[in-house]
Design a protein with these regions (language model features):
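Transmembrane signal-anchor hairpin modules in multi-pass inner-membrane enzymes, especially those
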Residues: 1-95, 112-129, 183-193, 234-247
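Membrane-embedded alpha-helical segments of multi-pass membrane proteins
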Residues: 40-57, 97-107, 169-177, 216-223
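Alpha-helical transmembrane segments of multi-pass inner-membrane proteins
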Residues: 52, 122-154, 161-232, 236, ...
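Small-residue-rich segments of transmembrane alpha-helices in multi-pass membrane proteins
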Residues: 74-80, 103-107, 130-136
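Non-cytosolic membrane-interface motifs at loop->transmembrane helix junctions
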Residues: 92-99, 155-160
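Residue-level signal for short amphipathic helical patches enriched in basic/charged
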Residues: 101, 116, 210
Length: 248
């Protein structure tokens, strides 16, 4: 007898693979929306709330590692709800707790889907970087009044991109800038021009935000990352590359 080879492994399920791909794309789009918070609730808030709900309904897997994070978040939220009972005037406390709960659920959700497929982490960072470059460009164009109405992307002559506050805009750009810097130092030289251009745009956005906290975060985190990579990597060629790029 002869055996017939199938084009897919026995464990491969095209339907499930398609759903996973669609889910990953939807998550990436949600992360991209995080760079646009002109008004509240922001598109990111509504989109992620719906996405998290659907994903939980369809069966989001919570591993032990993610479950530990969820447990800590629940304890943290319980403390917040208990603190309300000690307040004479509740005021806006319920709204702050609701926002905190949403952020906690978002953190657990992202950890869970990354734990399920680690490749999603790179996808998330790529989407975050795309959002950072886009909103940084808006902030830069607004600062230089590049077109009529561009001032809407500034406040008090400070770039704020598609955010409500320059002090939120600046810190949002830090992680993508580190991601690009790490790629410049570790990835192939062919991708250097694109990464360098994106890093330049984001760096200018951080500068024009005139956020001292963002400046300090950018300088300290970049210096620490380069230093740790320099110490960890034993290759002389890599260390030379780090020195050349850093000094350049």
């Amino acid at each position: 007898m002869t055996t017939v080879e199938t084009p897919f492994p026995a464990t491969f399920k095209p339907g499930r693979a398609a759903l996973r791909l669609i889910g990953s794309v939807l998550v990436a789009f949600g992360v991209f929306l995080s760079g646009f918070v002109i008004d509240e609730p922001a598109p990111f808030d509504i989109y992620m709330a719906v996405l998290i709900g659907f994903w939980f309904i369809l069966g989001l897997k919570i591993s032990r590692t993610t479950g530990l994070l969820l447990a800590f978040m629940l304890v943290f939220m319980a403390g917040g709800f208990l603190s309300i009972t000690q307040m004479e005037t509740i005021g806006d406390a319920p709204m702050y707790l609701a926002v905190t709960l949403f952020l906690c659920l978002s953190a657990v959700f992202l950890c869970a889907i990354i734990d399920e497929d680690h490749r999603r982490l790179k996808l998330i960072f790529n989407a975050w970087t795309a959002a950072a470059v886009t909103t940084a460009m808006l902030g830069i164009l607004g600062y230089f009044k590049a077109f009529p109405g561009a001032e809407m992307f500034t406040r008090y002559d400070r770039a704020m991109g598609a955010f409500q506050d320059p002090n939120v805009f600046g810190p949002f750009l830090i992680a993508p800038s580190l991601y690009l810097l790490h790629g410049i130092l570790t990835e192939k030289i062919s991708g250097l021009p694109v990464r360098a251009a994106a890093l330049g745009i984001i760096s200018l956005g951080v500068l024009l935000s005139f956020s001292r906290a963002a400046w300090a975060m950018f300088a300290f985190s970049a210096a620490m990352m380069v230093l740790l990579m320099f110490i960890k990597e034993r290759s002389g060629a890599f260390r030379l590359k780090v020195l050349i790029i850093t000094l350049g």
